[in-house]
Amino acid sequence: MKMFTVISYDIVDDQRRTSVMKVLKGYGVRVQYSVFEAILDAREFHDLSNQLRKIIDPGQDSIRCYRLDQVAAQRTVIYGIGLTTTDPTHYMV
């Protein structure tokens, strides 16, 4: 089952931060400077997690992933500009 996933990151090193951003762009939509939204099934989330863990320095960097079911995702509130990600915009082949 696909789940609405919010991924935020705080990466110290510019090169690692750029690498993380490029990986995330392949899975979802950037909604803020260090925040992405994606709709991922368990396999996609597992693959994404593995890629991100290979990039970061766990002693310096932080990535947080919030997996929301459909009910929780529908309670998302946005103030200001922007839309909630509702459909997958990237497909893995």
Swiss-Prot record:
Organism superkingdom: Bacteria
Enzymatic class: hydrolase
Cofactor(s), names only, from the UniProt record: Mg(2+)
Pfam families, per the entry: CRISPR_Cas2
Keywords: Antiviral defense, Endonuclease, Hydrolase, Magnesium, Metal-binding, Nuclease
Sequence positions that bind Mg(2+): 10
GO MF annotation list: metal ion binding; RNA endonuclease activity
Catalytic activity, EC: 3.1.-.-
GO biological process: defense response to virus; maintenance of CRISPR repeat elements
SUPFAM superfamilies xref list: TTP0101/SSO1404-like
Membership in a protein family: Belongs to the CRISPR-associated endoribonuclease Cas2 protein family.
NCBIfam families: cas2
Function: CRISPR (clustered regularly interspaced short palindromic repeat), is an adaptive immune system that provides protection against mobile genetic elements (viruses, transposable elements and conjugative plasmids). CRISPR clusters contain sequences complementary to antecedent mobile elements and target invading nucleic acids. CRISPR clusters are transcribed and processed into CRISPR RNA (crRNA). Functions as a ssRNA-specific endoribonuclease. Involved in the integration of spacer DNA into the CRISPR cassette.
Quaternary context: Homodimer, forms a heterotetramer with a Cas1 homodimer.
Name of this chain's protein: CRISPR-associated endoribonuclease Cas2 3
Species of the source: Chloroflexus aurantiacus (strain ATCC 29366 / DSM 635 / J-10-fl)
Gene designation: cas2-3
